[in-house]
């Protein structure tokens, strides 16, 4: 591990033996820098511009070398605003790529793309840092066993299970529960797997980043009394940042996650919100560097950039990084090159439905639209596969019958269809679950439901053994035993009212 010259140095003196160049041209966030002959920096090296602007305010801008232009010039992309920079300013070549702090010191803190804390809680120990540019693990290091990553969330584990070390796409509009689902996953991986999480906010709203931080503190995911007990590190490069920062902030978050996997040998959850913004920032940088655009104006290196990020997210013999990536689909066009390139890397999709959220069924995961490559008998076993398929068939039949019910009512259905509808409504409600992180809102204690318990519960509903229980007994409970207990309580309450 190498000390990060951009975040740990006691000033320019730390770079005394480094290459010195000067700014030759400034085009927005792109700088052309001239260096002495024979002293050119490498691609991806971090350059630091230090000096004072026209009103004598200190300037400290870090850039990353993207192109060697010839004539002893390089073209670099700035990681922060270039306001106040002038031609002729001195530029220091740090001789290394951007490096960021890693390890336990990152938990409970918010960082920017450079690994600098931005939460006003003081400096971070930067003795252990890691460069953000690395190659993906070699084939021989990979753990190729197909294993399920149990989340404790019934609808996910049963119908669209996550792969350990896999990549999951999270699709959903505003206000359907993405944030709460993300926080519950962070909470559950810490409790059940002893793992940690890294959240990369890539090109999204600053307000949402702040709301997430506040909600994490409120729900205990971040312990502000003792930060080392927190379960998550946050890395933000929001909408207002230059494209260079938005393009690299995903790599900063990934580097922190890799340390937990490779050195601490933990299971890590890596959230990227939003993977589309990573592509969008790359497109902006590509245009600024003068590359010829490809389809729909995207960068010609789209697949390469996406692949270099996604291939580092994997399981090794030491631990795993399981990634959940929010995917924005521009104009709902799934054939757009950005989401289409993302889909090629995904093992599962979790689709959140506004219709279910409107019914009050949380998590509002759509059981029919969500998919997983893991849902195969040879991976999950015959019992799990059969149960999941029967649940989907029942819900699909209910969906087909809804138009008839809306026009003619339940009474016009056949006896068999009425039974299907009754069981489907129970299944729909049993797919809801009280979350630990939502205790403060709902007043119901959170429930972690193991996969075996989940399968047992749905098998009992499908077998007809619970046909006599009321629908509301299945709503917002953990395992199936709680359903029978709740049904007994409901019956006692109704008897008392009589």
Curated annotation (Swiss-Prot):
The keyword Thylakoid applies. The keyword Methyltransferase does not apply. Its EC number is 7.1.2.2. Keywords: ATP synthesis, ATP-binding, CF(1), Chloroplast, Hydrogen ion transport, Ion transport, Membrane, Nucleotide-binding, Plastid, Thylakoid, Translocase, Transport. It is an enzyme of class 7 (translocase). InterPro entries: AAA+_ATPase, ATP-synt_VA_C, ATP_synth_F1_bsu, ATPase_a/bsu_AS, ATPase_alpha/beta_chains, ATPase_F1/V1/A1_a/bsu_N, ATPase_F1/V1/A1_a/bsu_N_sf, ATPase_F1/V1/A1_a/bsu_nucl-bd. One of its GO terms (cellular component) is chloroplast thylakoid membrane. It is found in: Plastid, Chloroplast thylakoid membrane. It is a peripheral membrane protein. It catalyses: ATP + H2O + 4 H(+)(in) = ADP + phosphate + 5 H(+)(out). Pfam families: ATP-synt_ab (PF00006), ATP-synt_ab_N (PF02874), ATP-synt_VA_C (PF22919). GO terms for molecular function: ATP binding; ATP hydrolysis activity; proton-transporting ATP synthase activity, rotational mechanism. ATP binds at residues 172-179. Belongs to the ATPase alpha/beta chains family. F-type ATPases have 2 components, CF(1) - the catalytic core - and CF(0) - the membrane proton channel. CF(1) has five subunits: alpha(3), beta(3), gamma(1), delta(1), epsilon(1). CF(0) has four main subunits: a(1), b(1), b'(1) and c(9-12). Produces ATP from ADP in the presence of a proton gradient across the membrane. The catalytic sites are hosted primarily by the beta subunits. PANTHER family: ATP SYNTHASE, ATP SYNTHASE SUBUNIT BETA, MITOCHONDRIAL. This is ATP synthase subunit beta, chloroplastic. The gene is atpB.
């Amino acid at each position: 591990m190498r000390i990060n010259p951009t975040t740990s140095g006691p000033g320019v003196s730390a770079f005394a033996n480094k290459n010195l160049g000067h700014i030759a041209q400034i085009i927005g966030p792109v700088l052309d820098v001239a260096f002495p002959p024979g002293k050119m920096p490498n691609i991806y090296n971090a350059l630091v511009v230090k000096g004072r602007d026209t009103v004598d305010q200190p300037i400290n801008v870090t850039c990353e070398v993207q192109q060697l232009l010839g004539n002893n010039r390089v073209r670099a992309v700035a990681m922060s605003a270039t306001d106040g920079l002038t031609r002729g300013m001195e530029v220091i070549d740090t001789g290394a790529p951007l490096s960021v702090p890693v390890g336990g010191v990152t938990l409970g803190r918010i960082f920017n793309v450079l690994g600098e804390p931005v939460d006003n809680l003081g400096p971070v120990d930067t003795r252990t840092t890691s460069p953000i540019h690395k190659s993906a693990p070699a084939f021989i290091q990979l753990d190729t066993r197909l294993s399920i990553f149990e989340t404790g969330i019934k609808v996910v584990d049963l119908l669209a299970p996550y792969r350990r070390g896999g990549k999951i796409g999270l699709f959903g509009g505003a206000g359907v529960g993405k944030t709460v689902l993300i926080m519950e996953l962070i909470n559950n991986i810490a409790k059940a797997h002893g793992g940690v999480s890294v959240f990369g906010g890539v090109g999204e709203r600053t307000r949402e980043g702040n709301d997430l931080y506040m909600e994490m503190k409120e729900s205990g995911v971040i312990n502000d009394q003792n930060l080392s007990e927190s379960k998550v590190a946050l890395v933000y490069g929001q909408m207002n940042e230059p494209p260079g920062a938005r393009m690299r902030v995903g790599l900063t978050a990934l580097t922190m996650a890799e340390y937990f996997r490779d050195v601490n040998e933990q299971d890590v959850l890596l959230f990227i919100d939003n993977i589309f913004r990573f592509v969008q920032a790359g497109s902006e940088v590509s245009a600024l560097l003068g590359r010829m655009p490809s389809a729909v104006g995207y960068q010609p290196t789209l697949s390469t950039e996406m692949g270099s990020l996604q291939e580092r997210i994997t399981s090794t013999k030491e631990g795993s990084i399981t990634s959940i990536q929010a995917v924005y689909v521009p104009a709902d066009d799934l054939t757009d090159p950005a989401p289409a390139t993302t889909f090629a890397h995904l093992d599962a999709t979790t689709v959140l439905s506004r219709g279910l959220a409107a019914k009050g069924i949380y998590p509002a995961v759509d059981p029919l639209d969500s998919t997983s490559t893991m849902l195969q008998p040879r991976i999950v076993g015959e019992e799990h596969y059969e149960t999941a398929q029967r649940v989907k068939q029942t819900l699909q039949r209910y969906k087909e019958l809804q138009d008839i019910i809306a026009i003619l009512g339940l009474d016009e259905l056949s006896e068999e269809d009425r039974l299907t509808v009754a069981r489907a409504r129970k299944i729909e409600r049993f797919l809801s679950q009280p979350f630990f992180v939502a205790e403060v809102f709902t007043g119901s204690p959170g429930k972690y439901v193991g996969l075996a318990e989940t399968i047992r519960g749905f098998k009992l509903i499908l077998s007809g053994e619970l046909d006599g229980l009321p629908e509301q007994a299945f709503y917002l409970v953990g395992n199936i035993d709680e359903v029978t207990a709740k049904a007994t309580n409901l019956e006692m309450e109704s008897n008392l009212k009589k």
